[in-house]
């Protein structure tokens, strides 16, 4: 809180939702609970935003979980109430298995912001996820990778890497712009210099009727 960061936690069961709600700014539903109605209902019954991870889930299971949440939260629009996280539950995950197009797919299907829960070694999948429209990025963090045996350390980020990752992701997000095509203000000054113009192909006497053969482009 002193650093201005939101505190988010995952209830291990429905019994943990109420006590965690008193401490947290948001709750997260783990991938393993995508089909566990008691925890989803309890989280939806809270007043907090909920982040729902979708690792191992079929799209029909995601549909059911979203519908269950909506039926309990009773919000006409779920935006700002529920966020989905695309996730590949492998440790580490291979980048060719990421299927990051699931991010825009679920966004369009459910009308919700979708994020990426990263288990790929390195920042590349996170970069690509933001380029696909991910609004949240979740990564594992460790104080030290070297010499650690547990699987999560290899795919985790050390503190100095987090600063670089956040900087890169902010730059990528800023580069996306709007869903349109128009010249930027900075490049509009170059339009005339980049386009071709009409010139005479040779010197002409006064009164000459201009024909195609007299014209060149440069």
Regions found by a protein language model. Give the residues of each.
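Catalytic cores and adjacent flexible loops of soluble metabolic enzymes
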Residues: 1-218
